[in-house]
A protein has these predicted regions:
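Alpha-helical secondary-structure segments
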Residues: 48-57, 119-129, 175-176, 214-219, ...
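Gly/Pro-rich hinge or "lid" segments in bacterial periplasmic/extracellular proteins
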Residues: 4-9, 125-130, 136-219, 229, ...
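Aromatic- and charge-enriched surface segment that lines or borders ligand/interaction sites
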Residues: 20-86, 123, 231-234, 282-284
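N-terminal lobe/hinge region of extracytoplasmic solute-binding protein
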Residues: 1-26, 172
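Extracellular/periplasmic solute-recognition and catalytic clefts
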Residues: 66, 180-191, 221-280, 410-411
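Surface-exposed binding/hinge segments that line
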Residues: 69-154, 183
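Short helices/loops that flank or line small-molecule/ion binding pockets
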Residues: 44-45, 229-240, 287, 371-380, ...
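Detector for C-terminal structural segments
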Residues: 183, 187, 270-271, 293-325, ...
């Protein structure tokens, strides 16, 4: 519902989009959104609260009615909602522009966690206080699409058979551009939306929320090219105005004054992480993990794998949440071979087995990082076997916390060192609970490749969801952060380049400016099309 957020000096501001405004109950369990009137989707279908209601419950339905359907956050009591095929059938009969009484009696039922109070007002009733709920509304389920169009083209499908019609036929949205044509694995053509509600916004209104800009060109073509040389050639010849350039051609970008590349701001959430498995021998021994984190030359790792642009962080919180980041004031793990050997000696392992580093072969940096770690750990007597597999295969080795524990039974896929997400990590949601929940919690749906869970840490994570007292949360996080630091299940590198070993590049004077995904690649890696301005 809430279309956009904006970073400002390390703070996060939530800006009105399709929601003109919202109110929050004193106990942070009820969020009421007043929606913008007179808005249509690009195909002319009206936008209203009924559309939003339908979208939320259809997403709930295709997740097999999972309690954590909203971006993996279990914030609703879904037991009071009875949404299923019969409800979808009723929506088909009634439509969403002016629902009939039978459907309306369901939509405005305030015993359900999400309900409407009129055509332009919708309420989200949480099961417990969560003061960061707005951070869930700017991603995935909160990116509003035309539910009426979904109904008219076969419905959403089911959890085991999601409707594939929309793969080649994108669902209309309310934004400044619409799809004109899509050729999968080839290109996508966007055209300015003739029905865009913000087409006549004043410069002052756009300045207040630049994500609402109607755009500065009529048509945008996005070509899908996997070859870095082809992308560099298109950029350097002017065939493309913006391109992704990676390590292969990066040395042609940096020294050339005609090129400009996007650098990740100081306040960011873009990271590369290395998990040390806490359940698999020998990294299930804390002293072994401490030996590993002190045996790695981080300056060398950043120089070789991340093109010199990055910094070691204190896991797991993102630095953008300054009030919750590294509350004990710890120092990042230091490269110290003497200390590493001491920890390894204290582990008291007679015959150290080799360990496995599993990562994706699809991107160069993961292999380079593996080689650096391999060489560093060899200095303290640990042999590292590199297991580089295609990205799609790597993804099958990771999942929920429970799924990851089950994988340990399969020695062919279990590994002591792995990269969460098999690539760089941008947050799934814009909340300070995100990193803690994803990387070090037993409620994790993706990211906890370390198979880590500790009662002190879990208690601190729970405080995000049952307290509004920042001081109280910080106190618990200080204990959790110290526990986590001593347990050493994670190494975190804050990235300086948008794509780890490359970035978005443009020619100076051709492109003036643009905005990017506030979730730092968590939702999208491209420039936000309507915000691109030209020189």
């Amino acid at each position: 519902v809430n279309e956009s957020a904006e970073y400002s000096s390390g703070n996060i501001q939530y800006l009105p989009g399709l929601a003109l405004n919202w109110t929050v109950s004193p106990n942070a369990t009820s969020y009421t959104f007043s929606l913008r009137q007179g808005v249509t989707f690009s195909n002319g279908d009206p936008f209203n609260a009924y559309q939003v209601w339908a979208q939320m419950y259809m997403i709930y339905f295709v997740t097999a009615n999972s309690s954590s359907w909203l971006d993996s956050y279990n914030v609703f009591n879904m037991n009071t909602a009875n949404f299923g095929p019969s409800t979808i059938s009723l929506m088909n009969q009634s439509g969403l522009a002016n629902p009939g009484q039978a459907l309306l009696s369901i939509m405005d039922n305030n015993s359900w966690p999400i309900y409407v109070t009129g055509p332009y007002q919708i309420v989200f009733q949480l099961a417990h206080p969560f003061q960061y709920f707005l951070g869930l509304t700017i991603v995935f389920a909160g990116l509003i699409f035309d539910s009426q169009y979904v109904l008219e083209h076969g419905g959403p499908g089911t959890a085991t058979a999601i409707n594939s019609f929309f793969n080649q036929n994108p669902i209309p949205g309310t934004g400044p551009y619409e799809f004109s044509h899509v050729a999968e694995q080839s290109y996508a053509l966007f055209t300015q939306n003739p029905n865009y509600w913000g087409a006549n916004l004043t410069p002052q209104q756009i300045q207040a929320n630049p994500f609402l800009d109607p755009g500065h060109v009529k048509n945008v073509v996005i070509n899908y090219k996997t070859d870095d040389i082809s992308r560099y050639t298109d950029l350097s010849t002017g065939k493309a105005q913006v391109a992704v350039i990676e390590a292969q051609d990066w040395n042609s970008i940096v020294p050339n004054p005609k090129f400009v590349y996007y650098q990740v701001p100081k306040y960011s959430a873009l990271e590369a992480l290395f998990s040390l498995n806490t359940k698999l021998y020998p990294t299930n021994i804390t002293d072994v993990r401490q030996a590993i984190v002190h045996a790695i030359n981080y300056s060398d790792l950043i120089s070789k794998a991340f093109l010199g642009q990055g910094q070691e962080l204190i896991a797991p919180e993102y630095p953008i949440y300054g009030q919750y980041y590294n509350t004990p004031g710890l120092q990042p793990y230091q490269y110290n071979l003497t200390l590493a050997k001491q920890y390894l000696s204290e582990a008291n392992i007679t015959n150290m087995p080799s360990i496995t580093y599993t990562a994706s072969s699809t991107t160069v940096w993961q292999g380079i990082a593996g080689q650096v770690i391999q060489a560093d750990l060899a200095q303290i007597g640990i042999t590292v076997n590199l297991n580089l597999v295609p990205y799609a295969q790597c993804q099958t080795y990771q999942g929920t916390y429970t799924y990851n524990l089950q994988l340990l039974k399969n020695s062919s896929v279990a590994s002591q060192i792995a990269i969460p997400g098999c690539g760089p990590w941008g947050p799934s949601e814009l909340t300070p609970a995100d990193a803690w929940t994803d990387f070090v919690s037993n409620r994790s749906t993706i990211g906890n490749v370390a198979d880590y869970s500790n009662p002190v840490v879990e208690t601190a994570i729970n405080s995000f969801f049952d307290s509004q007292n920042t001081t109280y949360i910080q106190g618990l996080l200080t204990k959790a952060q110290t526990q986590l630091y001593n347990d050493a299940p994670l190494i975190t590198i804050g990235l300086g380049l948008w794509l780890v070993d490359g970035s978005i590049v443009w020619q100076k004077g051709v492109i003036n400016s643009f905005l990017v995904d506030p979730l730092t690649t968590g939702t999208d890696t491209m420039p936000i099309l309507n915000t691109i301005t030209f020189g």
